Structure formats: C-alpha cells, structure tokens
Amino acid sequence: MEVKKTPLDIALEDHRSKDLPWVCFSLPHQNEVKLVLQSTQELIYADDQSTGFLVAPFDNASQKPLLFRPDAQWDARRSLLGDVTKPIQQMALSKSARKDHEALVEQALQAINAQALTKVVLARSIECEGAYDPWLLFRRMLHTYPAAMVAIWSHPKVGMWLCATPERLLRTSKQLMETVALAGTSSVSSLEEVVWGEKEIQEQRWVTQDLDNSLRSLGLSPVIHPLETIQAGPLFHLAQTISAERDGIDLDKLISVLHPSPAIAGWPRAAALKMIRSLETEDRAFYAGYLGWIDSGNQADLYVTLRCLSWKNDRVKLYVGGGIVAGSNPALEWEETQAKARVLAQLIG
C-alpha cells in the first residue's frame, strides 16, 4: 500500500523542482522532523546575528559557515515520512586508495614517534558507484539513528549532504553552554558487551582535557560530568558532558575554542591541524565540520558533521576517518576506515 504523502513531503517536492536551497533535520530522541526552505539560490553566510540552519566546513578559518534562511518551515513526525524498507542498489566501496592511505598513516607515525604530536585524525572519502535516493537514505537514517542528529541539506551552488551524528559540539542559551567530549567506537551488539581498552579511554581523556582547557582559556569554570557509554545506531561511544555558565561570551568565540576537537583533528590541536593540511590531499569540505540551528547568536544547538555522504554532479561520496597514535598499524587503520564505511553502506544499501 502506498504511503500517503505528508504536507512536508509535498512542500519539499515542489521546492526541489525549483532547485532551491533546503534542509531537513531531526534532533536526538525527538519524533519531530523540521524542514527549512530558502526562497532564493543565493549563498548566505552566517554572522553573530543570524537565525536559521548553519552548516560549517571542517576548516572554518578559510570559509564562513553557510546559512539556510528559514523563509518557510514545515514540521512532521518521523513515523509519517514513509517506508524505509524499500530496496535500493547495494553500495559498492572502492579499495583503490589503500596504498595512499597507508602511506599517509606511515608519515603520521613518523611525526608521532618524533614527538611532534600525540594523535592525528586522518580522513578520506570513498566514491560510490550507482544512483541513490537521498530522501530515502535520510528516512532510513532517521529510523536507524533515533539518538543522533540526522540532517540532509541541499544548495544548488554547493551540493547535497546527509549525516547522522551523535556528537554535540555546542548547545547554548543566554546564560549557559554545554559541549560533549566524545571518542571511541565499539560495534558490539549490546551495551553489556562493550569493553573499552586503554587506547579508547585515553583518546576520550584527551578530548575532555582539551575542551576543558579551551573553555578555561575564556575565563569560564567548566563542570565535567561523569563518563558514560552512549549508543548511536549500531555503534557505541564514550561520552562526557561539559557545561559552564556562559558569562556573556559570544557564540563565535565559543565555537573557535571548541572546534575542531581532538576527536576529529588530533592532539595537540594546532600540531594535528598542521599535519592534516600537509598530508590530506582532498578537502574535507563539510565532513567533520558542524551544523545545526542558531537564533540571533544567543541560542544554538550545533553538532559535529559525522557519518556523512555528499552528492555533487551525480557523484556520491562517503566520508570516514580514524585516529592515528603511537603503535597504530597502517594496514589495520585502513581496515578500520573500511569497516566504518561498511556500517554506513549496509545501512543504505
């Protein structure tokens, strides 16, 4: 039986037919899905007085965050967005970049062994063969990742991106701010089976320490909450909430000290960013950037852009990354990125 289209579905179909910018998203543990429609094709860049949906690249020093202006908005419930079981073409993952990625890991290990840094996160993209329905993939992610921020956005001058991220970068009100130090990944079948090794615990500790120090550099007094294991779809992560009174510090300044964290860049942050820029041959673009709703610079709910795909000129790319530390094995690091890619490929294929 054909599922009846919601007003949101109808509005989006009409908007897409005009090739106009739009974004659709749902927050963690929320049944509500929001659609934001922009009525012109212009590229709008966010400032400290903006209201709308913000999308920022990984390297936000070289490009301002993009803003989707809410000229029209629609709401629907996740459960009303239609069938997610419709079969689609199996996603094929290319293995052609293995030697290149292993060579990058070797170079990173040389720098780590020389004590230039402790950890660096290396990312790569995987081009996927075949045609995929982005709206169907978005609905599947909503179904599979109820504890994640799931978003799909499209701009005719930039392309289309889809992500499902468990990692909050920053939530603010006028008086308070909150961030999450998240690291470590486990793919066991239940919470009871999760056993964290020293590597994952140490990596999470680095993230917490970095975010705590960064907030203290602004004169804030962060409160570090207990460490916990959280689930996002088929994966588990170590997470620790950090909160503080905002003390009048503006949104841009808070973001500047929190992004990018060691979880997506490395440790120490400056050395890791320098290595990423020298080693990675492909621009990360919006992968490992951040996105979410902002309201006139006072209130924001932003997430790190992880588990994502992009569409541009009929090319589909999937993005993955992995943290390199002393003792990392290049072959195993390659396999880890392939495993992360397969989790996403199996979901959408």
Residue ranges of model-derived segments:
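C-terminus-biased signal that marks the final domain/tail of proteins
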Residues: 2-28, 33-38, 42-53, 65, ...
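Short Pro/Gly-enriched beta-strand edge/turn motifs at strand-loop
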Residues: 7, 149-152, 286-291
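An anion-binding catalytic pocket shared by soluble metabolic enzymes
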Residues: 11, 16-30, 124-206, 298-321
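Non-catalytic accessory segments adjacent to catalytic cores
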Residues: 27-136, 192-193, 198-201, 218-223, ...
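A residue-level signal for conserved active-site and pocket-lining positions in enzyme catalytic cores
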Residues: 54, 115, 170, 209, ...
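Contiguous alpha-helical scaffold segments within structured protein domains
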Residues: 74-106, 129, 178-278, 346-349
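Short coil/turn segments at secondary-structure boundaries
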Residues: 118-123, 153-155, 226, 288
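Conserved hydrophobic core element of enzyme catalytic domains
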Residues: 245-349
